[in-house]
């Protein structure tokens, strides 16, 4: 793969959306190389209406949601995602090489024809569906709707999380850190929210904290394959509980705050601690099935796929949850969120208390597994999409 020099890399990192279109294309072509062979068109069931979900498949969610909808209805579903070098290799129906997505006009036009023949398209994270075929995703949505396609929106997180509002939700917000570069994030999130409101149509969010920024949205919970994460084997017996933390982006998870406190506990013989990095998604079930406690995130004030996977694997999950998220979950599901909520700087005392209560520890494990089965197995998510968009009552 060709590589940009330092100046080019920094330009892309600070936000290519601010650059002229011709310069964005030039830099990306240098970075990504030439487009390869155009992938073949997907094969779908012509007897069924088709739902297409794309183009990011964060944490494999597009794939899982599509399968859940297909299992719960008469619809066929297809997910696709842009293949990012160095990614986590999540399951997806179609993976598009990033160079093809960015530079292949043949693929872009082919994908436009494919999606124009679908009945429903769920656009993820306000990311363009066809590379640079159109100037922006608003033009894409209008083109699809002109072809008779029913388009809805699914926001995942930073795409609509407004920094100036997030700092009011939690004092641990990454956007409250000295030196935080919030300008682009503020601009991008507000632009995306304004665009989806201008376009109108159903809006879904994958985590309940995002309802703050789009109160009109419906929560479509992240979902997992329960069988993949659950294990019939008992946890290994050990003198000290194994605490793991698997930050995809350490700065955004509060790793820098909690780790010094975890190292103190480890030196005191209270816990064994492992930081999980660069582990393929296929290996993560084994990691969580071997762990006792999983530390999620301490800056967003919410929870996501990591917490759900860990609860399914029989771990107690600790993270920072805002009151708004706790209320939203209980209002939507009728049950309390079984994550131990903890301020980042209190992780030491919270873990000591948690470990000392063996009976309560076991109850939390069982509550977490029940919660995942009821809310995050895909059935709840499929109902959200079907009842509020695909098959409204």
Residue ranges of each PLM-predicted region?
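Conserved donor-binding/catalytic core segment of Leloir-type glycosyltransferases
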Residues: 51-52, 220-221, 226-253, 259
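A charged, aromatic-enriched C-terminal amphipathic alpha-helix characteristic of glycosyltransferases
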Residues: 60, 356-389
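Acceptor-binding helix/loop patch of EC 2.4 sugar-transfer enzymes
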Residues: 90, 153-185, 252, 329-331
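Donor nucleotide-sugar binding/catalytic pocket of nucleotide-sugar-dependent glycosyltransferases
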Residues: 174-232
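Conserved donor-binding/catalytic loop of nucleotide-activated donor transferases
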Residues: 289-291, 309-316
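Aromatic "clamp/platform" in nucleotide-sugar-dependent glycosyltransferases that forms part
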Residues: 299
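Short hydrophobic beta-strand element within catalytic cores of glycosyltransferases
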Residues: 316-325
